[in-house]
Curated annotation (Swiss-Prot):
The gene is flgE. It holds the Pfam family Flg_bbr_C. InterPro entries: Falgellar_hook_FlgE_sf, Flag_bb_rod_N, Flagellar_basal_body_rod_CS, Flagellar_FlgE/F/G, Flg_bb/hook_C_dom, FlgE/F/G-like, FlgE_D2, LlgE_F_G-like_D1. The lineage of its organism: Bacteria, Pseudomonadati, Spirochaetota, Spirochaetia, Spirochaetales. It comes from the Bacteria. This is Flagellar hook protein FlgE. It comes from Treponema phagedenis. It is found in: Bacterial flagellum basal body. Keywords: Bacterial flagellum. GO terms for cellular component: bacterial-type flagellum basal body; bacterial-type flagellum hook; cytosol. Belongs to the flagella basal body rod proteins family. GO terms for biological process: bacterial-type flagellum-dependent swarming motility. Its main location: other. PANTHER family: FLAGELLAR HOOK PROTEIN FLGE, FLAGELLAR PROTEIN.
């Protein structure tokens, strides 16, 4: 039999394999996160008719005579290039821009995918809605009122408890910043309402008690008569009920004696110090904190029958600086509270996912807190992963073990919520490869036809 017959058969068989891969690529042109396949060929073993000989004194060397026996598939690679990103606006749709895989769990089995079309089941678990596999990451822990995500722990299911209640939190810190106008006139004795409006700067801000009830915090600044760079600050919680709340302020104490303090500035307009009515002065450097306290109306009295008081810090900024600090320059007054940490009771209404994969819950009371963080897996040889169907991969002997971290670390890409990575199949390339494959298949068939004709000629010699 002629060797060319078997070579032609191998050509047809292996080009059929290549066509199968191309057909699968084309079929998955719109599959989320799909990575195209690629077939590489190599020749089969060659039959040696004669070996090579070295040159001698009389004649030169002779090359070997070898006849190839066909072609075989060298490899079928998965090409992990980036697919195009498509915006969906759905906050559970997540794309990886760069390297990395999402981690899915089915019981104890781990799967990996770049298809981030996720959803939330009835228990709030973030899942792949097509098969129920659970997305892995790290849940935040509440440690002394702070949400901490420990990414060195084992990964776990991510749960987004929509509708979950968050307890009210009393205000513990109120931060003030911006400017007091040095040109503001001193407040004269016996001042009328017009004089007060011209000579003071008042700012209101909402704070919360332990029940989550909202209170108005009012701070009024006025120039200290006979001084250049001092202001009298008067603090009241619920100013319309001053007798009930009995606001008091002090430095280094949870309960002062009066509701006023003196703010001093240096000759450069920067915050210098604060003095309370007891003569206590803040440190010459660092943050300037004044402790304010008030009666919580409606709370049970303490064991001695005294009203329950709530204390919080008034943060005026850092001495000697201008950033996030009260200053005194010859510009209009703009000082106001810009931040406080209390809130009323609320319910989880929505969530968002940032580029590092941190899931932040947004509550009905305006508060937000971290819920968890998505994990990404990387591999030394991602081409060595085995396809497991349903847009997933599993670890193999040649992929290496999964290196699990957050996004943006150790070569992993960033996450983009509201976006999906599409298939990386390029139809132009696939149709071109299809034509080449078809011609290769036809060439193999032609080899068989020609060999058959030659054999027929040999058989006809007998006639």
């Amino acid at each position: 039999m002629m060797r060319s017959l078997f070579s032609g058969v191998s050509g047809m068989q292996n080009h059929q394999t290549r066509m199968d891969v191309i057909g699968n690529n084309v079929a998955n042109v719109n599959t989320t996160g799909f990575k195209r396949g690629r077939v590489n060929f190599q020749d089969l073993i060659s039959q040696q008719l004669s070996g090579a000989s070295r040159p001698n004194e009389e004649v030169g060397g002779v090359n070997p005579k070898e006849v190839g026996l066909g072609v075989m598939v060298a490899s079928i690679d998965t090409v992990h290039t980036q697919g195009a990103l498509q915006t969906t606006g759905i906050n559970t749709d997540i794309a990886i821009q760069g390297n990395g895989f999402f981690i899915l769990k089915d019981g104890e089995k781990s799967f990996y995918t770049t298809a981030g079309a996720f959803g939330v089941d009835r228990d709030g678990t973030l899942v792949n809605p097509a098969n129920g596999m659970r997305v892995q990451g790290w849940m935040a822990e509440d440690i002394e009122g702070q949400q901490i995500i420990n990414t060195s722990d084992q990964t776990e299911d991510l749960i987004i408890p929509i509708g979950q209640k968050i307890d009210a939190k009393a205000t513990t810190d109120v931060a003030y910043a911006c400017n007091l106008d040095k040109r503001l006139p001193e407040l004269p004795e016996g001042a009328n309402q017009a004089d007060i409006l011209r000579s003071t700067w008042a700012t209101d801000f909402n704070v919360y008690d332990t029940f989550g009830e909202q209170h108005k915090l009012q701070m009024v600044f006025s120039r200290v008569p006979g001084t250049n760079n001092q202001w009298l600050a008067t603090v009241n919680v619920d100013p319309e009920n001053q007798a009930g709340t009995e606001t008091r302020v002090g430095i280094g104490t949870t309960d002062g004696t009066e509701n006023t303090f003196i703010v001093s500035f240096d000759n450069y307009g920067h915050l210098a110090s604060v003095t309370d009515t007891a003569g206590n002065v803040t440190a010459p450097a660092g943050q300037v904190l004044v402790q304010a306290s008030y009666n919580v109306v409606g709370a049970n009295p303490d064991e001695g029958g005294a009203p329950t008081r709530h204390t919080f810090n008034i943060n005026l900024g850092e001495i000697g600086t201008s950033r996030n600090t009260i200053t005194q320059f010859a510009e209009r007054s703009t000082t106001k509270a810009y931040q406080q940490d209390g809130y009323a009771m609320g319910y989880l209404e929505n969530f968002k996912i940032d580029q590092s994969g941190i899931i932040t819950g947004v509550y009905s009371n305006g508060a937000s807190r971290e819920i968890g963080q998505l994990a990404l897996a990387g591999f030394a040889n991602q081409g060595g992963l085995e396809k497991a169907g349903e847009n997933t991969y599993i670890q193999s002997n040649n992929s290496g073990i999964a290196n699990i971290t957050v996004s943006g670390v150790m070569g992993k890409g960033k996450l983009i919520a509201g976006t999906l990575e599409m298939s990386n199949v390029d139809l132009t390339d696939q149709f071109t490869d299809m034509i080449i494959t078809q011609r290769g298949f036809q060439a193999g068939a032609k080899t068989i036809q020609t060999s058959d004709t030659m054999l027929e000629t040999v058989l006809n010699l007998k006639r």
